[in-house]
Amino acid sequence: MGPIRKPVNQWELSENVKRNLGTFGEMYVQYSTSPSQTAAAAVFKMFGQYLRTLFQTHLEILQSDGAGDPSVRMDVLQRIEELLGTTVSDDSVFEVIEAHLSKVKDIFGNCSVTWIADVKAADRAVTAAVTGTVHAVTGGMGAMWGTLDRAMIDLKLDLVLPPTTGPSTNFVGVALPATPLVPYTAGSAQGSPLDPTLDRFGALFGLFGLTIPTATKKVFLEQNDILNKAVQAISVSYTAMNSNFQAGLAKYKPPRVPTADGALTARGIAPDRPRQAKYETVKTYATNMGFDVLIGGKVPGSKGDIESLVSGILLAGKSLDELGALVGGIGSDGAIVSRDQMDQVRSLIDSLVKIIYDTDRDRFIAMTGVHVITEYANDLLRVLDLIAQKYGEFQRTISGLEPSWATIVSNTEGLIPLYAERAAYAAERAVIIDEFQKMAMDHANNVKEVEHIRERAAATQKQTEERRAVDIQKLAVETTAKMTDMKNGYEKTIADLRAQLSVANLSLESLKGTLKGETTLGTTVMDLSKANRQLESRVAELQGKLGIQENEAKLRDEQHKAQAEQIANLHRDLRVATERLHKKDTKILETGINTGVSTARVRELEQRVKELVAEKKSIRHENRMARRKMDPTEAAAKGGPRQSERPRSQTAVHAHCALIRKNLHDTNKRLLTRNTRLEKSISSKEELISSLTIKGNALSSQLADAREQHAVLKREYDALRAERGGTARTKKDALEALQSKLTQSESQLAIEKLKVMELEAAAKRLGKSSVTKSEVETVEVRVNLLTEELARTKKTVDELRKLNNAYLTAKDRLQARVEALTTDNQSMKLLVGNGGTLDEANKRITTLTQRLATVSGELVTATETLAFVRGSLKRVNHQRDELAKESAATKKSCEAQIRALTDRHATEMRTAAGARDGLEAELGRVKRTLVDTETKLAGVERDRVVLRDELTRMQKASHIGADRQLTHAEKVAHDMGVLNAGLTLARTELREIQRELVHEKNKSRDAEQRHVASEAALREQIRTLTDERDRLLATGVADLQRENAELHAAITEAANTCADTKIQLENITADYNGLLAEYERRLGRRPPGPVDPPATTEEPIAGYGGGNWDTGSGAARAPIDHHDMFGISSLLGESQGGLSDYHGSYAGGRELSSEESGDDESVDPVPDSNGTRGDGVCREEDEEDRQGGETESGGEEEESEEESEESEDEDPPSAGGPLELIGVPAGGIGADPEPARVPSRRPVTLLERRGAHVAEPKPTPRVRGKRPAARHSHKRVHLSITRETLRLALAAGPEMSAEEIFQRLNTDMETSSLINSLTVTAADIPRGQLAVLNRDTAVEYATPGTPVSDRDHQRVELSMKAILLIMICAKHGIMNHEEFTDGDLSWFKSYDNNLSVTGSDSE
């Protein structure tokens, strides 16, 4: 088995169980092949050790720090990620748990647990089996094997136990119902009382493919006393564990949490409280501590599952957020402004204290249970070791076992409980019997019909044989007469041919004399043929070189395309330079505007200097009077102080300010002059750029013309090649003319062949009897009918399969509804336990009874439908098999008859072929004589003429093609020279532009150095303007220099490419001339045709749009925008998107309307220090008024359209999406806003504390106080719903009522994200009173306490999607069910289909 690595977390533990169970299986396979005593003892010893390690490791992981304390584990997704070992994004909690359960089911085999509720039920059944075995099974053996059963079920091996008898009890005196379990298939209902125990023994080892013979049972009974003592020890340990657990719970001391009024008091763990009832017994806690913790993802907490544990912690976090929001909204003096706020603060504090108590109590219970369960597990493991040790004594009998994997399969099938389906199977059996009887009758009828068809086929075959004998005799007589006529005709034809042959022999003798004189001519013709073959080989060689030249021409064309792209890049770079110059002009204009702003600042400083001088004079006057101990009246009477200092101080100040104004005026004038000069320079550079653009376009047109000429030459070359192909076709025509006479002589033979074919056709027609055709047609009709019946049967089977699938779907839906009813029943029990009224319980019971009756009826109907469908499917399958067999038999019979007819016809054809072969042999000899004679006579003269014409034509075409090729190469070289000259000119002009820009830069620096501020009072402002101007000018010049360098590099590269292309053209021309000279030297003439490069596809030259102007990668480089440096948008009154301070203006802020924005025109807006919109310049008291106004009424800033579009178009992230909300006034939608004393801060959400991205919510426009609220003002509220938000909603506890849900949907920012596209039509909705109207179904849902008379004015219309999410919250316990009085909720069963919808609605 190898070493077992100790896991460190639950995921590794699960993988370890999976791997080692597979290893145990391999060990048993090896043992089964060669059984021995040593191997058996080793296997079971290692299995016992592994069980001990498994239990201890599981308990250590639960208590270790690495796995996390169960009471502090907060995040459900983190818990699931640790269990799965993978990253979980935004899937819902329940889907992940269900997927994990399915994976565990595959790992551990035939595990029937599919949900957490089933896990709890299975654990309760195991506990009942363990505690009830002492009373149900004879002796202590039953208790021992019950303990083993508990261990096996903890390992999810699903060992099925025999039924227990009598009620079983746990150790605290609470009666448990008897658990009926499916008995083992070995027949436990008969035999001795020890048979059930022995059956369990066999089932345990049957899991591993082993069987227990009688000898083993005997040894087992001998060990009864020893194992009974072990079971008694386990019972004592169990009782001690229970006592220790109760004692540990009694030691619990609740924490002391101070409260304001001391109304809440801490309580201990009391057994009589319903909330703590499930922790009073070790049985229930041991269930929670079993292996279902590993599988179902549970943690020891308040309720033993993930949802309840996390909901309390999330509720605490949410309460803290709400408390922070309330505290932030209270006034600066600390007073609570309303009774509602006071009640809300008190309830939040109480809920926080309650959560602290519950969390601490659950943590104590979990730790106590961990301690006591560890001791019990150790005792249990010791007993398991004892069992493994004693089983080593069974090795003498085990060695004789013959395990078989077939036994494993049969035992596994016997373990599956089938009681629930026996009734359905019995009904199906009756239906199947009826259908079988019907099918038997149909089969008998089909057999009779087949026998009748066979009889008819036999009679038909007999008639066919008789008619065929008569027809063959007639055919033999007619054939003999026709063969005689054909023989006479052939003899006459042969005599004529022999006469013609004698005449041809005489002509041949005369031609022989002529041929002797033509011997020299024949020799010449042979020489010409040899020269022609050499010429053809050379032509093939030149064609190969032509292919190479064509490839080189393609490369040149690609280089031309690259050059065209480089020219286009140069055009784009020139355009970028033009845009940069325009931007520089804009920046200079902005500098002038800022200079005007500085002038206004100088005036303000002058006013401030005047005020300071006056204040200084007053202070000196008072000091002087104090020194003289005189009041101002006496000083005035005695002449007062000297007045000469004041005029002198005022004059100095005025002179100083005049000097400053003069300097600023001169500076402004110099800047305007420089601006004019730069504009002229820019216009001149634009003219240069336009001229370069025109030249580039001219080069592009020349390149296009060159391509057109190349295409024309290519077409001519194709025409010449076609003409050369025509010459070859002429030679072929000459050869065909030589065979024309042969064709004439063959025509007579063809006529005779046609006659023979007619005879063969007649024989075939007569060989087939009409009776045989009728018989075959009859059989074929029957086969077609059977085929159609089979197709209809297949169609029926498909329809039945569809019905079966529909039934399975309906069954799943019914199961879901049954689970919903179970949840309703549990919630009703909770309602009664919490003190609900009897009337409410009765109403709920009535509703559930009706729904249960409906579901039961549908279940019965679906079961009957399934039985009928299964019976019909079996009947149709049987009928299809019968039809297939009958069709195969009929087809086989038809094929046998056809083969017999074919053999008979072949025999007759062989007889007729003998006479035909003799005639064809004689005609063949005549044919060969004629062909030899005519070929020798007609070949010589025509070949001589054809060869002479071909040589003349090829020589002329070769001269013409060579001349055209040289002309084309010279033209391409000339075009490249023109292109190189144009690029050189463009490079020279760009260098001139660069020198001008450098000169302008030097002049600008000189002007900047001369412009230095001379006054200390304004030195800081003037230095700021100078630095800004220097930075802008340096940036513009550096960009232009960099662009010029890039243009220079591109032009240099293009020139180098042109030079390389020219060299390549020269080399190609030289190679061509060399080949031409070699051709003429060897053959004494020029080649037969021109050799030109192939035509290329014209591609348009790239324009100015698109593409990266720097690298050509296809993405345009965004221009740098320095717009924000000067605050131009602030000067024009526009808002910089994303820079407004939302936190300080949300609670009490308001948005100025178009009328209000024009009331205050005395404020001159200027940019403040951070670039956002300022509030004005002029007076300090204006600044103080603005600060006071923000405190009382606020000043909310507008958001730009770009920011709004970006926030709406953004997709939410996959995990932890943004909760982007639109806030609503505290009084409800449409209510008048209450003035807040301080700006309230937005509370920090739970997602922000975890680090998730939460976007800034958009502030809602506020309505002015002096404006009365409209009763029906339609408002649009766009909200978003994500899986993260839904997960938070599902994790919330049931403490929130429906009224609180509705209030948060309309007033609270955090929980209003539960609804997607909430449309509110009521203008004024009081708190606590609300009615919801579904626009799709016209169904109204009213909250308690809503007056009927005012309902029309307090209605909120929700879309189907919004109500759908509310109902999901209700399903998971956030609100109570009975507050929705409408009964038609059939659409609610498909709510899962809408969970993936995100974003805002367009309604």
Curated annotation (Swiss-Prot):
Signal peptide as annotated in the record: none
Record field: compositional bias (Acidic residues): 1154-1163, 1193-1212
Biased composition (Basic and acidic residues): 620-632
Domain of life: Viruses
Biased composition (Basic residues): 1261-1275
Spans annotated as Disordered: 620-650, 1083-1116, 1142-1239, 1253-1275
Protein's UniProt name: Uncharacterized protein ORF22
